[in-house]
Amino acid sequence: SGGGKTHLALELLKYLCGFVDRAAYDTLEQGLSLSFQNAWKNAAMQEVGSRVIVLAKEPIKELRERLRKRKSPNVIVIDSITALVGFTRTVFMELINEFPDKLFIFIAHEENNKPYPAIAQHVRKLSEVKIRVEGYKGFVTTRFKGEKGEGGADFVIWEQGANEYWIDKL
């Protein structure tokens, strides 16, 4: 909590809006709280206009109904798995199998350097790209080949926060 996950997800979503017509951010954990509104402003999400819809704590059942409609979002951020009640391996597999042409970005917390809750570990194992966030840095792991220019590089989410966090850890 407080390491930059939401900000990173918003920045990534803003970037992906350059390639898709519609995207959705399901803010299950924070809802439309002041902290989420501040993260939205800090990521300058107004730049994407109406291409991103914010879903305030929309459960998976309703999200699936939304995604079945014409002109539904192409990219969906779920923030976070921790706040998803009843999200099981079966529900996850049904979701990604029903919508194979959608890009899902799942956010999870960590306990002992592992995704939490347990379903988050399963989601991570099946993901093409994983970004572990710690101390305002994103550490990328991917199934793509970095030497072919397909992978991704680690990056700083917030320079001042990262500098303060990592100064004693290096």
What are these regions (language model features)?
Residues 1-61:
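Conserved P-loop
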Residues 15-19, 47, 68-71, 96-100, ...:
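Conserved catalytic network of the ASCE P-loop NTPase/AAA+ motor domain
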Residues 4-8, 85-90, 115-116:
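Active-site-adjacent loop/helix micro-motif of nuclease/hydrolase catalytic cores
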Residues 54-107:
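Phosphate-binding/switch loop-helix module in NTP-utilizing enzymes
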Residues 35-39, 91-94, 122-126:
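Alpha-helical scaffold elements adjacent to nucleotide-binding pockets in ATP/GTP-utilizing enzyme cores
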Residues 97-170:
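Phosphate-binding/switch region of NTP-binding enzymes
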Residues 28-30, 81-82, 109-110:
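Short, ordered loop/turn segments at secondary-structure junctions
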